[in-house]
Amino acid sequence: MNQMWRTHLQSKVEQLKEQGQYRNLHVTEKAEETWLIRNEKRMLNLASNNYLGLAGDERLKEAAIACTRKYGTGATASRLVVGNYPLYEEVERSICDWKGTERALIVNSGYTANVGAISALACRHDMIFSDKLNHASIVDGIILSGAEHKRYRHNDLDHLEKMLQIASPEKRKLIVTDTVFSMDGDIAYLRGLVQLKEKYGAIIIVDEAHASGIYGIGGAGLSHVEKDIAQKIDIHMGTFSKALGCYGAYLTGDSIYIEYLQNMMRSLIFTTALPPGTLGAIRKAIEIVKEDNERRERLIENGAYFRTHLQEAGFDIGNSSTHIVPIVVGSNENTLRFSERLQEVGIAAIAIRPPTVPVGSSRVRFAVTSQHTIADLKWAIQHIIRIGKEEGFLV
């Protein structure tokens, strides 16, 4: 190996270790509905994004198997070559029915959706206004676009408006936000954002990755909690890999947006399409979430129970109001120790550190699901509080 490169890379790895930001891949040997096995230890899973417990649902498995038998294990090409199976158009129509939009486009992941769409829509002559805590895929899409990047303070619409006020009226403007923030569990003020986009002649993209399948009528997303808001969103992005228990993502909105992205989005054009079996599972998952209000209600109730008890115990959970509940610890070292101690007693909860979150705000991120029982959560809360006290995070 080239010695110059070896020295450089080894130095960077050692630096990560010293800063408490080194990451390892740990094998999950078996994952049940709410429990998993890691390092031969059975743990309550409070770390996954399987919010509605659908990843192991037999109906999705059977749908995937049926489509795999019919079409094969791989799409064999890009959608724009010969990889566009009939399932794509069928599922895209169901997304439009679900979201009340004109046209939809399925892509391979939430990351490629955001990077591809933002970098295709905007260029160096444009301005993009992005919440400071937006997902990395949004940030990377903005960087790739070359557009002027304006980051407004988290959920601070006054700050955003000041930026919009001084922006050149000659420039195209794009506002982009997560709807549920993945590391904080709080939500965007969509009505205010829509009002600002209309007032200043912008368009808006919302990332519903952690809200699709959960909020709004039929689980259509947080933007669908109030119908008039959904109709004013220009482009909705959502994923199938979280509440829907599958893989992949979608972009949907007015036809002209989707037509443009289909022709200009490099992360669609230059990649092999999703396997047919995945599309079969997606189709079934959408059917289920549109009808299964009980799972959504149970998830929301579980989130409220978990949040309330941790907050009452004295933990810093920020402004979480959803099923994602962080305990903000601060330093990397203390956060890693907290996570390790939780895993020792059988709770899978992972330390989240920079660059995923801002420096000084490292945390253990908990994610409850609809399938957790109150007994599960009560047991976990007792251990979390005990360890928190022993480690000095609680008085």
UniProtKB/Swiss-Prot annotation:
Entry-annotated residues carrying N6-(pyridoxal phosphate)lysine: 242
Pathway field: Cofactor biosynthesis; biotin biosynthesis
GO-annotated biological processes: biotin biosynthetic process
Protein name listed in UniProt: Putative 8-amino-7-oxononanoate synthase
CDD domains, A to Z: KBL_like (cd06454)
Species per Swiss-Prot/TrEMBL record: Bacillus mycoides (strain KBAB4) (Bacillus weihenstephanensis)
Molecular function in Gene Ontology: 8-amino-7-oxononanoate synthase activity; pyridoxal phosphate binding
Catalyzed reactions per annotation: 6-carboxyhexanoyl-[ACP] + L-alanine + H(+) = (8S)-8-amino-7-oxononanoate + holo-[ACP] + CO2
InterPro entries attached to this UniProt entry: Aminotrans_II_pyridoxalP_BS, Aminotransferase_I/II_large, AON_synthase_class-II, AONS_Archaea/Proteobacteria, PyrdxlP-dep_Trfase, PyrdxlP-dep_Trfase_major, PyrdxlP-dep_Trfase_small
Sequence similarity: Belongs to the class-II pyridoxal-phosphate-dependent aminotransferase family. BioF subfamily.
EC numbers for this chain: 2.3.1.47
Positions with a binding annotation for substrate: 23, 135, 356
Domain of life of the native organism: Bacteria
Cofactor(s) listed in the protein's UniProt record: pyridoxal 5'-phosphate
Amino-acid positions noted as binding pyridoxal 5'-phosphate in the UniProt annotation, renumbered to this chain: 110-111, 182, 207-210, 239-242
Assembly mode: Homodimer.
Keywords: Biotin biosynthesis, Pyridoxal phosphate, Transferase
